[in-house]
Every structure is written in structure tokens, then in C-alpha cells.
Amino acid sequence: MALSELALVRWLQESRRSRKLILFIVFLALLLDNMLLTVVVPIIPSYLYSIKHEKNATEIQTARPVHTASISDSFQSIFSYYDNSTMVTGNATRDLTLHQTATQHMVTNASAVPSDCPSEDKDLLNENVQVGLLFASKATVQLITNPFIGLLTNRIGYPIPIFAGFCIMFVSTIMFAFSSSYAFLLIARSLQGIGSSCSSVAGMGMLASVYTDDEERGNVMGIALGGLAMGVLVGPPFGSVLYEFVGKTAPFLVLAALVLLDGAIQLFVLQPSRVQPESQKGTPLTTLLKDPYILIAAGSICFANMGIAMLEPALPIWMMETMCSRKWQLGVAFLPASISYLIGTNIFGILAHKMGRWLCALLGMIIVGVSILCIPFAKNIYGLIAPNFGVGFAIGMVDSSMMPIMGYLVDLRHVSVYGSVYAIADVAFCMGYAIGPSAGGAIAKAIGFPWLMTIIGIIDILFAPLCFFLRSPPAKEEKMAILMDHNCPIKTKMYTQNNIQSYPIGEDEESESD
């Protein structure tokens, strides 16, 4: 018995020092965060539309009995002086006649259009803005929160912020499940932004500090971004199918259970009660923001993701308007983009280091732009498969190239403390998801969905040549002097915090000597 307990304790200690387990935690955190991000994409436009029209139907039904109660028991027929006709007031006939006179325009529209086609185009156009603002609220809050989380990780380490992200995301998921008004949905979406900021900034910073070799770091970040891709992949079809066949609450309750599982693993492995500050002071955020190479990498992340961010609120509404798509199709339409993003991040997480990350990002930006330009030509859901596949694959190329470059640029040109630089990367990601839905909804309402796609497609293509400057970024003078003095390639371990290999847990810490 004692031997088995000792073996269990030893296994726990080894697990807590495992870099692969840390990678799994970050993978799972990004997976669930992005599932919650995208599960609402097919649900919210249809749900808000149904809320509004159910309310209208309820008002009509409550107004109708006032007329029927006074006449139903007294008369078997009524002569109308308006059109010189006699109406029989039996149950079925009375209901039909009154329904026709009270809501004739609604019946006409319903009979002319299939049930899956919304009947009022004006409502859909207005919903572009409403849905866009709801989707953008998460990214806007995350945008504001990211710099503070980056500074916080430098002071207290990564475990506490990433665990705080789990707690906030659980509350947000429960709110989504039981919210029945636009205001509460907006609060839930905004709250998710704070949780996402904690998870993504702390998660990517943790990976950068644990995996110090540039090539190895690129590989594991490609795997971690695979978690993001899986969330984006599973979210829309998962949400749309459960929404249509079970109800709005079901997908969020399933997600809440998965989030609890993630929290239990974090609690076991990361021990988030322990404060683990960095061993050296990182480069100020303002200095990083003045670095043109970091800005180019951040711009690539921003504009590439802005394309899919504009699609999320606008594409389902455009499909409802032009294709009479059913609820489940609104989510399945994003499936090609999600699958190809997963493929892209896993392939180019490894390949980008060999072919040149700058070239990978440049080609990705061009493919994103061309694919987005092709989307408005689709006549049905099958016509969306190829362009959406291209969008997802290309964004996977950009993300899997630019995320490792952010860490590489800090190693090369600044102090190797990663919280702030990955806060900038996440800010860029969030700017795409903040500006994209809010501006995209307004543009789609004003000039139409095809012009919206044309604008963002051209922007992506025009930005692509800037990635050439990332081909061989120069090192700072003091870094170059160190490299020349030691006459060796870049070894990021010489700049990083002490005890990286045993991070984050491990009581027996060994100091590294040069």
C-alpha cells in the first residue's frame, strides 16, 4: 500500500513537471474558449429573430380575444356592411376570418415564402448591426483587458491568470445558457472577453517560456493553435444542430461541463495558488509597440482574422436572406473554414520554419483575400465550400507563422519575457474580431454583403507585401554584441526565467549555470 502511494506521489510530481501536460492544458483552454466563441454564430441571429417575432405574435394573440368573446355566443352569422357579405361564426371559420382581417399581411407573406425564409427583409438588415455589436463586444473587452493581463503575468506568473480565465468562462457559459434577452446575451459575451484574455495571453506566454528552442516553439504553438482551430471547427455545427433539435440551452450546458473538466486539470497541474513572478523585468509594452517588425506581425494576425470575423455575423443573415437556409445550415457553412484552419495550423506549424515564416504569412494573406472575394458568388450552401475552405486554410498559415515570430522577435530584439508580446498578439487578434463584426454589420446594412467581402478581401491582398520585411529582422545592438561575443546561434534559454524546464510546479528547483 505504501509503495503504491509512493508511486502515485512520484507520478504526480513528474506529471506536474511535464511540458506536454502544460501544452495539453493550453490546447484545451483555447479549444473551449473558441468553442464558446463560435457556438453562438449560428444561434444568435436566428434566436434574436425568433425572440422579436414571437413577441409580435404574442401581442397579436392577446389582442384578438377581445373581439371574439363578445360575439361568439350571441350570433351564428354576421352581415358585413363593409363588403356586403355574410360570415358564418363557427369555431374554425371565426378563427380563420378574424385571423385574416387582423393579420392579413402576415398570412400573405407566410404563404408566399417558405418557412425557413424570414419574411421581413428590413428586420434582417437591422439585425446585421445588432448581431455585429454583440459579436464584437467580446473582442472589444478582450482588447482592453489584454495589456493588463500581460503585465500581470510578468508579476505573478502564468498559472493564476489562466485559472482565472477558466472561472470567468464558466460563468459566461452559464449566462449564455439561461439568457433570454439581448442585454443579458451582451453581458455574457463581454464577460467572455475577460476570460479569453486571461486564457490566451497566459497560455501562449507559458508555452513560449517552457519551449525555448525557436523551431520547437513553432511546432508546439502550431499544436496549441490546433486547439483554437478545433474550437472554431466544432463550435458552429455543434451549436446549430443542438439548437435546432434540442434547444438553445443544450450546447451551453455541454460546454459548461467541459469547462469544469478543464478547471479540474488546471487545479491539479498548475497549482494556481502559487505566485511565480518572472526572474527579470520584461521590455515595456510601449517599447514593443514601437517595434515595426512586431507591428507588421500583429497587423497580419489582425487583418487575416478580420475576414472571418466579418463573415460570422453577416454570412448567416445573408444566407437566410438569399438561400432560405435552415438553422443547422447556418453553422455547417463554416465547417470547411474550420476544417481547413485545423489542417493549416498543423501543417505550417512545422513547415513554416523550413520555408520561411514571412513567406508563409505573405502567401496566406493573398489566399485569404482571394477566397473572400469569391464568397458572394455562391448561389447555395455548396458554393460556399471552396472559398470558405480557402479562408480557413490561409488564416491557419498566417496564425501558425506569426505567433512563433512574436516570441522570436522578443528573443532577438528585446528581453525574453513573453507576457506583453503575446498580449500584443492577442490584441491584434481581438482588433480583428472587434472591428470586423461591428463595422461589417454596418457595412453590410449600408452597401450590401458583396461589397463588404470586396473591401476586406482587397485590404488583405494589399497588406500581404509587408510580410517581406519579416524575412530577416535585425537584432538590437546589445543582443548582437552578445551573439558575436559568444560566437554562437541564438539560445533563448540564456535570457529566459530561471527553472524553465521544471515550470510550473516542481518543488525541487535546480538553478541553471551557463
Swiss-Prot record:
- Give the Phosphoserine positions (modified residues): 511, 513
Report the outcome of residue 312 to A: Abolishes binding to dihydrotetrabenazine. Abolishes dopamine uptake. Abolishes serotonin uptake
Q: Give residue spans on the Cytoplasmic membrane side.
A: 1-20, 151-159, 211-219, 272-291, 353-357, 411-414, 463-514
The segments annotated as topological domain Lumenal, vesicle are: 42-129, 181-189, 243-248, 312-328, 379-389, 436-440
Outcome reported for the amino acid change (mutating residue 429 to A) = Abolishes binding to reserpine. Reduces serotonin uptake
* Reaction catalysed by this enzyme: serotonin(in) + 2 H(+)(out) = serotonin(out) + 2 H(+)(in); dopamine(in) + 2 H(+)(out) = dopamine(out) + 2 H(+)(in); histamine(in) + 2 H(+)(out) = histamine(out) + 2 H(+)(in)
Q: Which InterPro entries match?
A: MFS (IPR011701), MFS_dom (IPR020846), MFS_trans_sf (IPR036259), MFS_Vesicular_Transporter (IPR050930)
| Keyword hit for Glycoprotein | yes
* Outcome recorded upon mutating residue 33 to A: Abolishes dopamine uptake
| Record's protein name | Synaptic vesicular amine transporter
Question: What results from changing residue 189 to Q?
Answer: Abolishes serotonin uptake
Q: Which SUPFAM superfamilies match?
A: MFS general substrate transporter
Q: What is the effect of changing residue 338 to F?
A: Abolishes serotonin uptake. Abolishes binding to reserpine
Q: What is the effect of changing residue 228 to A?
A: Reduces sensitivity to reserpine
User: Which superkingdom, per the lineage?
Assistant: Eukaryota
Q: What is its main location?
A: membrane
Effect of changing residue 341 to A: reported as: Reduces binding to dihydrotetrabenazine. Reduces binding to reserpine. Abolishes dopamine uptake. Abolishes serotonin uptake
- Kindly give the CDD domains that the UniProt entry links to this protein: MFS_SLC18A1_2_VAT1_2 (cd17384)
Q: Which residues are glycosylated?
A: 84, 91
Q: What is one GO biological process annotated to this record?
A: neurotransmitter transport
The UniProt family comment states:
Belongs to the major facilitator superfamily. Vesicular transporter family.
Q: What is the effect of changing residue 221 to A?
A: Reduces dopamine uptake
Q: Which disease does its entry mention?
A: Parkinsonism-dystonia 2, infantile-onset: An autosomal recessive disorder characterized by infantile onset of abnormal movements, including parkinsonism, dystonia, and poor fine motor skills, as well as autonomic dysfunction, including abnormal sweating, cold extremities, and poor sleep. Some patients have variable degrees of developmental delay.
Q: What is the effect of changing residue 41 to A?
A: Abolishes binding to dihydrotetrabenazine. Reduces dopamine uptake
